[in-house]
């Protein structure tokens, strides 16, 4: 097609050139130019016919190729559609299997949770009973400790009272002993003082008698 357009363009350019230069040539040259133009027109017509034939052949080949390509495309599309259907079926089967697996896993999880809850409840009850027993034992130990402390306090109080009584008795005995000793000491001192006084009086009388006798002596 491009070749035919180029050939027609050449013919038009040649005809234009001939038309421009026609007034400047002699009749013989004009006749030769006309003959050449006629021949060129025939050649251009032949070229156009050949180009049309080539274009028709190319169009036929292109149409056949397009038909083959379309058939191949349809086959490809059909194959892709079949593959898509197969993939969709596989996906549906996989989804079904996944749903079944999920349901089974959920059921297993529920059963496991129930078992764990039961275990937790049993452990909680055991822990509560153990805690209650421990609390009762602690309360009993506290009561025992309190009773022992009260008994120890009573013993200490009794011992303190006995010690206080013993101290009071000892103080009373010591006071009585001291009073007796003081009375004895006082009596002893009084007797000694009386004896000393008598001795002193006797000595004084003797001295007086001696003095009188000395004074009476010649």
From Swiss-Prot:
Detected in blood serum (at protein level). Detected in liver. Residues 1-23 form the signal peptide. The keyword Glycoprotein does not apply. It is found in: Secreted. Thermolabile, displays irreversible loss of activity and aggregation at room temperature. One of its GO terms (cellular component) is extracellular region. Its main location: secreted. One of its GO terms (molecular function) is antifreeze activity. InterPro entries: AFP_Alpha-Hairpin_sf, Antifreeze_1. Keywords: Antifreeze protein, Repeat, Secreted, Signal. Gene3D superfamilies: 6.10.140.1860. Homodimer. The concentration in blood serum is about 0.2 mg/ml. Contributes to protect fish blood from freezing at subzero sea water temperatures. Lowers the blood freezing point by about 1.1 degrees at a concentration of 0.1 mg/ml, and by about 1.5 degrees at a concentration of 0.2 mg/ml. Binds to nascent ice crystals and prevents further growth. Belongs to the type-I AFP family. The polypeptide has an alpha-hairpin structure. Two subunits dimerize to form a four-helix, rod-like structure. Each subunit is composed of a cap structure and of tandem 11 residue repeats with the sequence [TI]-X-X-X-A-X-X-X-A-X-X. Each repeat forms three helical turns with an average of 3.7 residues per turn, as opposed to 3.6 residues per turn for a classical alpha helix. This is Antifreeze protein Maxi. It comes from Pseudopleuronectes americanus.
């Amino acid at each position: 097609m491009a070749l035919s357009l180029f050939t027609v363009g050449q013919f038009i350019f040649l005809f234009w050139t001939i038309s421009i230069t026609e007034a400047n040539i002699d009749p013989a040259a004009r006749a030769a130019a006309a003959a050449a133009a006629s021949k060129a027109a025939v050649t251009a017509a032949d070229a156009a016919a050949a180009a049309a034939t080539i274009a028709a052949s190319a169009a036929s080949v292109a149409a056949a190729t397009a038909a083959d390509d379309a058939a191949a495309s349809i086959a490809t599309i059909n194959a892709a559609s079949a593959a898509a259907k197969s993939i969709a079926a596989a996906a549906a089967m996989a989804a079904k299997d996944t749903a079944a697996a999920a349901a089974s896993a959920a059921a297993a999880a529920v059963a496991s949770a129930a078992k764990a809850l039961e275990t937790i409840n049993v452990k909680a009850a055991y822990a509560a009973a153990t805690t209650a027993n421990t609390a009762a034992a602690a309360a009993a130990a506290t009561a025992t400790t309190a009773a022992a402390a009260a008994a120890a306090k009573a013993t200490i109080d009794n011992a303190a009272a006995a010690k206080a009584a013993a101290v009071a008795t000892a103080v009373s005995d010591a006071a009585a002993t001291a009073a007796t000793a003081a009375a004895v000491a006082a009596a002893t001192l009084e007797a000694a003082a009386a004896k000393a006084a008598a001795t002193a009086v006797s000595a004084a009388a003797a001295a007086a008698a001696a003095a009188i006798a000395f004074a009476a002596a010649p």
